[in-house]
């Protein structure tokens, strides 16, 4: 096969390589608490299998990535890093010559290079390795010493009776040992301390804690060490182990855990003194967080610190008030969470204290609800939550631990009993949902009863899985007897964006309705900003991650993950690999994708997967390296990088040292480059940006005078045009004559001359006077000849529903009037202002006062109002009657949407990426199961799609669109509009709201509507979760810090709604981007802020309803 190369290579000449190519940088910044920011603090990753002397071997730490540093510093100033991997000239050579450096140097310059750079890096590595491994070895020696067991020590070997000896290899120039990867640390089984060991009673004096590192402890006095390992080990050495783990940020409170072992709290009980060791839950949290880091040096959590030896905080002791030291001690909360307004969860997460005992699982482990008191008329759940007794035995897990569904009496004629004793409604049996934990409600069910299709083998699959190109039936029967329009394209044949295969899209009736010349062409230009500096310029979709468009790729998890991972320097060619799967190269001759070579994928995964593991993330499952061809294949071409391929993407800032940091870190007040170059020249002018006078915010020049204010005082939209005295300035800074303003005809290209022409103003009696603007002046309307149909037109034009009251109010002397044209009924005008003309008098001297009633919205007559569950679950019909499904043929469901009026729907703009033709879309209402038609279902075609003009695919900002339906919906209990907020109505942080949609639950999209309750998170806190995106006031963050429920329960365009007093529900957000469904560490979802866009939404509806026909005419 042919390998694509972007430069001429000479494979016979190799440059010497070292473990830190050209440099070893260090960063003393403590890694941030979030997962993506934590990656930045890891520094550089090492070369697997490379020994200090350059020989090919298993690696000094026996892992695929190891800790290293450039130089040794005194204790307290040590800087840990992951060494950067080598930049091989040709990846192919890596397998033939191994990962080690060549034995012979070609030139004296290379020798000098090794002496000055390689040796300090290796020395620093050895020091850290020695500390970690010597600690493990010390644990072993101390344990046998404390248990009167003497190991036999020889040169390089430690022999323990009954234990296979472990060889320790020493370098000649150092005393640092290395453990081969095939061997593991033996498990010692010392005597477990008895309960008395954990709370030693004696009469010794309590001592003050003087060790500087342990001043973080929430107590000040201690006893002599209690654990044998601490007694028989140097204290500095013991604490240094936890200090290094702390700097690796594997667990927020790891240093506190180590200090609580070294200095147990001294508790006075009369004449006795006893010390408290950490609680078992504290130990388990520390072990869970840091064991993966220890695994990177082929070690494990020390058996001498096994958690089973510690007491559980729930254990009681009649003579001791506290049995162990817990993170949840009242006097320790303030210092551990950084303030008295926070609560410390058992997991170590800090949440606002006001969230404690509020009935919500904010900690993800219910510890914020664990010690709450319930009133007598409420049921106390096992999780600590308080419930009304009416919620017991109703089939819903309201408690979160099923404690409200235990010991229930089932009516077997109407209910089904699950294996755990829970009772569920009989209609839930065989409906395709696993309502029972043991899934007994879906046993022996026909596929049809679940709304599914039966394979020949009897397996059930959704109907949309038929003829989709994937064999979902184990016997492959779902891909048999497929028509040509459904058959996936054979290799080498051009295909549309959908699934049909054609020779050309132009004029072909075989093309799917959502295909076009642009997306059916062989190649398309790369527009994904992240990959704009590739050696190729065209791509072909779908990509290797399953994204169908570049827009879908830009908002994917991988588009945020890979740039953040690049910062760790785990692999020089990681960004190149990421782009080859996000925007695959398109062969201009064949129109086919060119995949990356398998070796490139394998190297990327081997060197960077362990870094993800440290922060609890996994390598993207769709990047299975076996799907890519070997370089030596004869029948397929694959991609390998040039030596000079650019490591930093356009979304990164390149430090002077060459390191890549995210562009969002540029000029953020914190030095991310090792040379601080990212914090230099940070003024707006120095960066060729425009500066807002009020807050010194920097704006791109393309945002100045574009019709949308960006500065807080709107100064970026001032002095943008020079209109004459007889002209007025449009919102887009065009000039229009005054006498054309609010005349019922569109003169500004953005229609702004006809905005807000009809309003209601209050007078002294609190009546709402009808006011109409003509020629930029306000006028009251004379009541002479007024009809009720005009009141209806006025209320409708203002988007205020039907008129409920029309009054005639006495006018004032000398005011200016607008009167109806004598023949107004024959004018066929669509707006009120074009039916009125200026007059000096009004014979009746009466003016119009209106009271418009908003349409009834946000009601759920068919919902079971008291059924709510944290953590997300399948919803029931009628609970969310405004939820709709935006669909196209043949793809089916694409996005969620929200009904806001009988003919109007909201969704996000990115759903229409590359598919803005209204003819290919339809909207389905009143449906819960996408694969099962409902008797309440209504379908409408799309008439108009209106994307926000400021929508940006690069930053996913202004992500909103208004959709006009072909016909009004029929309002029922299952199809009803939601309320819109007022422009001034914003959500307070820590408000709880609901998200709904057909989101992602596992590998495939669920076909039942999902719902989940989420908490509103402040924007400043939200920004800390997302390095690659900027959180603006046009966005809302919602979810939980723990990631339990986020918008993976919903899908793009789906609603975020909050209940208001009176039982009405208001739409505050549309699911936009942010959440990662299979990770609990990346934080909340991000939603378009509907309150910000209410004015724009109402304006679009007004323009389409009243002005569009006139402007087209």
Curated annotation (Swiss-Prot):
Disruption phenotype: Mice develop normally, are viable and fertile but develop hypertension. They display increased body weight associated with impaired maturation of pro-NPPA which can be restored by injection of Corin. Spontaneous and salt-sensitive hypertension exacerbated during pregnancy is also noticed. A cardiac hypertrophy is also detected together with a decline in cardiac function later in life.
Cytoplasmic topological domain: 1-112
GO cellular component, one term: actin cytoskeleton
Spans within the Extracellular topological domain: 134-1113
PTM comment, free text: N-glycosylated; required for processing and activation. Activated through proteolytic processing by a trypsin-like protease; cleaved into a N-terminal propeptide and an activated corin protease fragment. Atrial natriuretic peptide-converting enzyme, 180 kDa soluble fragment is produced by cleavage by ADAM10. Cleavage by ADAM10 to produce soluble 180 kDa soluble fragment takes place after the transmembrane region and before FZ 1.
PROSITE patterns per the UniProt record, alphabetical: FZ, LDLRA_1, LDLRA_2, SRCR_1, SRCR_2, TRYPSIN_DOM, TRYPSIN_SER
InterPro entries per UniProt: Corin, Corin_CRD_1, Corin_CRD_2, Frizzled_dom, Frizzled_dom_sf, LDL_receptor-like_sf, LDLR_class-A_CS, LDrepeatLR_classA_rpt
Topological category with respect to the lipid bilayer: Single-pass type II membrane protein
Span of domain FZ: 201-327, 518-641
Top-rank EC class of the record's enzyme: hydrolase
UniProt-listed SMART domains: FRI, LDLa, SR, Tryp_SPc
Site (described: Cleavage): 868-869
EC number, UniProt record: 3.4.21.-
Cysteines engaged in disulfide bonds, as pairs: 206-266, 214-259, 250-290, 279-324, 283-307, 337-350, 345-363, 357-372, 374-386, 381-399, 393-408, 410-423, 418-436, 430-445, 447-460, 455-473, 467-482, 523-586, 531-579, 570-608, 597-638, 601-625, 648-660, 655-673, 667-682, 684-698, 692-711, 705-720, 723-735, 730-748, 742-757, 782-884, 857-979, 895-911, 993-1058, 1022-1037, 1048-1077
Function: Serine-type endopeptidase involved in atrial natriuretic peptide (NPPA) processing. Converts through proteolytic cleavage the non-functional propeptide NPPA into the active hormone, thereby regulating blood pressure in heart and promoting natriuresis, diuresis and vasodilation. Proteolytic cleavage of pro-NPPA also plays a role in female pregnancy by promoting trophoblast invasion and spiral artery remodeling in uterus. Also acts as a regulator of sodium reabsorption in kidney. May also process pro-NPPB the B-type natriuretic peptide.
Name this protein carries in UniProt: Atrial natriuretic peptide-converting enzyme
Originating organism: Mus musculus
